[in-house]
Amino acid sequence: MKTVINIFILFTFLASLSANAQRIKDLADVAGVRSNQLIGYGLVVGLPGTGEQSPFTEQSFKTMLSNFGITMPDKLKPKIKNVAAVAVHAELSAFTKPGQTIDVTVSSMGSAQSLRGGTLIQTILMGIDGNAYAVAQGSLIVSGLGAQGLDGSQVLVNIPTVGRIANGGIVEREVKSPFSSGDHITFNLRHSDFTTAKLLSDTINDLIEGSAKALDATSVRVRAPRDISDRVSFLSVLENLEFEPASPAAKIIVNSRTGTIVIGSEVTLLAAAITHGGITVTINEIQDVSQPNAFAEGETVVTNQSDINVSNSDARMFVFKPGVTLETLVRAINEVGAGPGDVMAILEALDQAGAIRGELVII
């Protein structure tokens, strides 16, 4: 059944949304509409003496020659320093048709010093199902540079053993998509959240009543036309609907290897006091009560007053105004000369003490 949408109602609905609203297409993917990874094994030829002499490269070279009708004696060991065995991989986007081209990445598998100046000869790219979906060939673009002296010393700029061929793969087979089957389409949120899933469902139902249903924190199922052309038009309208997603969960992400710390805007602190090495952190929470006069017809209001003090061994002291956040704490610790390791240790201690309103995630 063909779906008819009132254009006037649609634009009135879109114009009434918040300035912080985001499109559905920016928050969710359509189930079944995805890319597929392809991989293949091939040879890069034409290298200026920067290739390799590994056994599997020699075997691959002999196999390639035999495919062209050239037979080499088994005991003959060819000198092929201008050849390198490589892994070739690419991504086949959804709905890519036969005859279209895709970019491919070529990486050395052996001891080749550089792939600069090389050409990938025809390589079949296969999917996880073992079927061939594309063929790759062409000259490599290598951004890296390497140089080596006779004493074994070498200098590397970027990575010379990985190259790329723009539009170097020709698609030979299309991947079938479940997009056109069934009477429903499903939106999958990129970041699972029950509230956002409910809001997405409500937004679609405000336009087409009873058509959407939130299945869980990730998926929202929508009733859709069976005809493929109607389904495309239907989806083009839905994916441009805007709504304001729920605020993300309060999280602190800490990368222990790089020292990177990312703090969500919803993270706050409870009252706590910490001493770490020469650093002392004190957080005080004081509640003030505002009591109106007896006949003022006002309301009693309780307000929170927060004070944070940070000091180190050289007696420097930092005093902050009320409204303590974790961002303020981290900035204060950095100002007294603490490194990322100190900040991470303090965050872990605060989390163990239950003083952080949020989740601490260490990666």
UniProtKB/Swiss-Prot annotation:
Pfam families: FlgI. The keyword Signal applies. It is found in: Periplasm; Bacterial flagellum basal body. The keyword Coiled coil does not apply. Keywords: Bacterial flagellum, Periplasm, Signal. GO terms for molecular function: structural molecule activity. One of its GO terms (biological process) is bacterial-type flagellum-dependent cell motility. One of its GO terms (cellular component) is outer membrane-bounded periplasmic space. InterPro entries: Flag_FlgI (IPR001782). Residues 1-21 form the signal peptide. Its main location: periplasm. Belongs to the FlgI family. The basal body constitutes a major portion of the flagellar organelle and consists of four rings (L,P,S, and M) mounted on a central rod. Assembles around the rod to form the L-ring and probably protects the motor/basal body from shearing forces during rotation. This is Flagellar P-ring protein.
